[in-house]
């Protein structure tokens, strides 16, 4: 469950590594898998050889977002246990999201890691098609 001030991993290649939830859209309850949230980019992901330990850390041209940007995101994994209709219980190791634009399309072109199958019920099939595996 994701609520205000929760730090969430960003698993796409948009350039964000860690984001902070500032609002759960269309709900007064905490966000679950498939819910849309508003986030602020807290930490950027470094790409390329120039961002190594010996070199100067630079903002790569591959980054589509910067630190401090306010974006929409979809929750794809939560650390809180939840029960599926068939009785199985699912729990992930971390909280993760995918950044999207205002139209609901993912900003990144590749996802790292698995996503929950509940995204299919919430009509996020574009995110499911980018993911390497869904559980």
Locations of regions flagged by a protein language model:
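Ribosome-associated RNA-binding proteins
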Residues: 1-135
């Amino acid at each position: 469950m994701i609520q205000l001030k929760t730090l969430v991993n960003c698993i796409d290649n948009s350039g964000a590594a860690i984001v902070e939830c500032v609002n759960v859209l269309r709900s007064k309850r905490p966000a679950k898998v498939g819910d849309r949230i508003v986030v602020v980019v807290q930490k950027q992901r470094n790409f390329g050889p120039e961002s190594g330990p010996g070199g100067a850390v630079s903002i790569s041209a591959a980054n589509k977002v910067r630190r401090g940007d306010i974006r929409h995101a979809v929750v794809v994994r939560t650390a809180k246990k939840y029960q599926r209709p068939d009785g199985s219980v699912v729990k992930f190791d971390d909280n993760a999201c995918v950044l999207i634009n205002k139209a609901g399309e993912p900003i990144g072109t590749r996802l790292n890691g698995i996503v929950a199958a509940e995204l299919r019920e919430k009509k996020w099939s574009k995110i499911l098609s980018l993911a390497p595996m869904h559980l």
